[in-house]
């Protein structure tokens, strides 16, 4: 992302730290923001555990340490590892986590409004997760009609997974489903593309790209993807056409619940009771 996307809380944390630890590529974006005398520890790729260990080592010396990640550190970032390491080591070091703007959020803003309804995020990296599990998640997302953001779509040694994802989505979605992808979101090299599921070319995607696949309601307006919330058009009409029975049930449940003399019934038993009374109309 860009410097403008750094939240004030994150900026304050960076500027109040004695030590900054992170992947060496990220320092190019924040070095000019650091206060004088800040110690910077940079490491290469796949050195996450070493970075976490260094962070605890410096913190044990009484220093304020900031571990940086791109986007939101809690989304495929360093935050989970830091908390896991604290648990495993029994450390008493205090941890504070600050939210950031994740790559899929930045990409979505550049593409229009593609995640206006239910969505999920899937990483295609099988470094930590077996591909069999990733494929199950892909199939579930496609079948459930989620707008789907794709992280880590390709790498130097991993290319076929995106082809497989496209194949799986085409089993559940129409070929004309809008798809957007953004390379280097928020950076000078930024590129924004809109296409369809059928025309998505995995060869145009690299490791710095985030892909967003629309759901069955997503449409294109110019170069923008829009996933409606349901205020207009087909979704609202479908709700009117199919929601009568559901509306009756909801109103019935509310009426029954108000009439219950015992309001302290455990929720699992109350749920079964509401169903039974509603079904028999015994109220």
Regions found by a protein language model. Name each.
Residues 64-65, 143-251, 275:
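A contiguous loop/helix-start segment that scaffolds small-molecule binding in enzyme catalytic cores
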Residues 1-95, 201, 238-271, 275:
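Class I S-adenosyl-L-methionine
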Residues 40-42, 95-97, 121, 179-181:
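Conserved beta-strand scaffold positions in the cores of enzyme catalytic domains, especially
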Residues 2, 71-76, 101-103, 155-158, ...:
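Gly/Ser/Thr-rich loops at beta-strand to alpha-helix junctions
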């Amino acid at each position: 992302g860009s410097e403008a996307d750094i939240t004030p809380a994150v900026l304050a944390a960076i500027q109040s730290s004695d030590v900054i630890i992170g992947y060496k590529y990220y320092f190019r974006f924040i070095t000019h923001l650091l206060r004088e005398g800040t110690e910077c520890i940079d490491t290469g790729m796949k050195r996450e555990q070493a970075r976490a260990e260094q962070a605890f080592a410096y913190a044990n010396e009484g220093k304020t340490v900031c571990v940086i990640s791109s986007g939101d550190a809690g989304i495929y970032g360093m935050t989970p590892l830091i908390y896991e390491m604290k648990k495993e080591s029994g450390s008493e070091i205090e941890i504070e986590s600050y939210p950031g703007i994740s790559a899929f959020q930045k990409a979505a803003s550049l593409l229009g409004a593609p995640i206006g309804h239910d969505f999920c995020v899937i990483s295609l990296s099988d470094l930590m997760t077996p591909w069999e599990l990733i494929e199950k998640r892909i199939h579930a997302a496609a079948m459930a009609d989620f707008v789907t953001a794709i992280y880590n779509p390709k790498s130097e040694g991993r290319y076929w997974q995106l082809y497989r994802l496209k194949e799986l989505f085409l089993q559940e979605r129409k070929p004309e489903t809008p798809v957007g992808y953004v390379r280097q979101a928020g950076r000078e090299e930024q590129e924004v593309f809109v296409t369809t599921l059928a025309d998505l070319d995995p060869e145009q995607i690299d490791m710095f790209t985030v892909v967003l696949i629309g759901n069955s309601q997503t449409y294109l307006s110019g170069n923008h993807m829009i996933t409606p919330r349901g205020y207009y058009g087909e979704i609202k009409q479908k709700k009117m056409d199919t929601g009568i029975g559901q509306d009756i049930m909801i109103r019935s449940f509310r009426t029954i619940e108000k009439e219950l003399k015992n309001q302290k019934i455990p929720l699992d038993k109350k749920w079964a009771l509401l169903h039974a009374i509603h079904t028999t109309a015994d109220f």
